[in-house]
């Protein structure tokens, strides 16, 4: 991934893409058209019901539900694996059920959970953060989408788990605090499973009829089948073509691929992102270490964003305009 780059788009190129990047977000009166489409895609009555509620009514309803994860000194919570869905040759969706089917996760936007596993021969437990892809207000369970890495002890353990086994969780781990209309335009540069915290924010925006934030996504993967959550992203892009645009990059594109290949480059970012001087924008970055190094520079620690370097610095963005997950 991110080895070479040529950007060939089937959409109107050049000036049309630049226009999208620079124009203000339209102000539609409602997100209702999305609700039905996503409800059908999800196949759940609750999924549809909760989108018909006003944000205030939904918030009040959620306050009445018990939360599985409350942070602080709560400690680890063991959840049972209830289902496994194979998404590709090395990616699976794992559903973990809550002890109480009416409880919700207690996560907020944007936040993650820690997972813990200690094998019989391990001296120390393996602890890794994951961002659930299920709704924060979904009662009864949470879903993780996990790619198995050859030398990844937690991802390998998850892929070897059987239904009925348990995994320890802890959280929520706060990331970027999101509020509706906090920014006029957000831009997301993601690689591989780095899409999961991005999708958490994207979903929150388009589930809220009062949030008019515009979203641009640049998403790199190795192959087309590695593009996680593509179905959900397509629904959003088709429903909100003036508020959500996704640009995909593949290291190994199939025949007939019409979008980008290889590296995220300065040329691409200059074309699809709003100019640095644009007011009230935010750029989010999440992906493998090589992508951080090239695009934004790495974080110093989970709580220290580090200095802004790489392509975004070269293009003139400042540190306050960028957040690294």
From Swiss-Prot:
PROSITE patterns: FAD_FR (PS51384). The chain crosses the membrane at residues 32-48. InterPro entries: CBR-like (IPR001834), Cbr1-like_FAD-bd_dom (IPR008333), FAD-bd_FR_type (IPR017927), Flavoprot_Pyr_Nucl_cyt_Rdtase (IPR001709), FNR_nucleotide-bd (IPR039261), OxRdtase_FAD/NAD-bd (IPR001433), Riboflavin_synthase-like_b-brl (IPR017938). Its EC number is 1.6.2.2. One of its GO terms (cellular component) is mitochondrial outer membrane. It catalyses: 2 Fe(III)-[cytochrome b5] + NADH = 2 Fe(II)-[cytochrome b5] + NAD(+) + H(+). GO terms for biological process: ergosterol biosynthetic process. It is an enzyme of class 1 (oxidoreductase). GO terms for molecular function: cytochrome-b5 reductase activity, acting on NAD(P)H. Its cofactor is FAD. Its main location: mitochondrion. Keywords: FAD, Flavoprotein, Membrane, Mitochondrion, Mitochondrion outer membrane, NAD, Oxidoreductase, Transmembrane, Transmembrane helix. May mediate the reduction of outer membrane cytochrome b5. This is NADH-cytochrome b5 reductase 2. It comes from Coccidioides immitis (strain RS) (Valley fever fungus). The gene is MCR1.
């Amino acid at each position: 991934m991110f080895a070479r780059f040529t950007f060939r788009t089937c959409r109107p190129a050049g000036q049309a893409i630049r226009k999208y990047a620079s124009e203000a977000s339209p102000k539609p009166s409602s997100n209702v058209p999305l609700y039905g489409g996503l409800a059908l895609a999800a196949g759940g009555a609750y999924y549809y019901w909760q989108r018909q509620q006003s944000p205030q009514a939904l918030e009040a309803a959620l306050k009445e539900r018990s939360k599985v994860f409350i942070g602080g000194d709560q400690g680890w919570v063991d959840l049972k694996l209830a289902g496994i869905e194979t998404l590709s040759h090395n990616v699976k969706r794992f559903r973990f059920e809550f002890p109480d089917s009416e409880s919700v996760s207690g996560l907020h936007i944007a936040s993650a959970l820690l997972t813990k596993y200690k094998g019989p021969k391990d001296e120390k437990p393996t602890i890794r953060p994951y961002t659930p892809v299920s709704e924060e207000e979904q009662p009864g369970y949470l879903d993780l989408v996990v790619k198995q890495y050859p030398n990844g002890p937690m991802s390998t353990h998850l892929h070897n788990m059987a239904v009925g086994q348990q995994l320890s969780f802890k959280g929520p781990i706060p990331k970027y605090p999101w509020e509706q209309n906090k920014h006029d335009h957000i831009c997301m540069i993601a690689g591989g499973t780095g899409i999961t915290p991005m999708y958490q924010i994207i979903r929150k925006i388009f589930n809220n009829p009062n949030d008019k934030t515009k979203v641009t996504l640049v998403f790199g993967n190795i192959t087309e089948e590695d593009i996680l959550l593509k179905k959900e992203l397509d629904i959003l892009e088709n429903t909100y073509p003036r508020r959500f645009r996704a640009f995909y990059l593949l290291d190994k594109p199939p025949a007939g691929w019409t979008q980008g290949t290889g590296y995220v480059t300065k040329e691409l970012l200059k074309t699809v992102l709003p100019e640095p001087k644009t007011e009230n924008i935010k750029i989010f970055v999440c992906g493998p270490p090589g992508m951080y190094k090239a695009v934004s520079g790495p974080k110093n620690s989970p709580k220290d964003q580090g200095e802004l370097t790489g392509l975004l610095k070269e293009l003139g963005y400042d540190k306050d305009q960028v957040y690294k997950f």
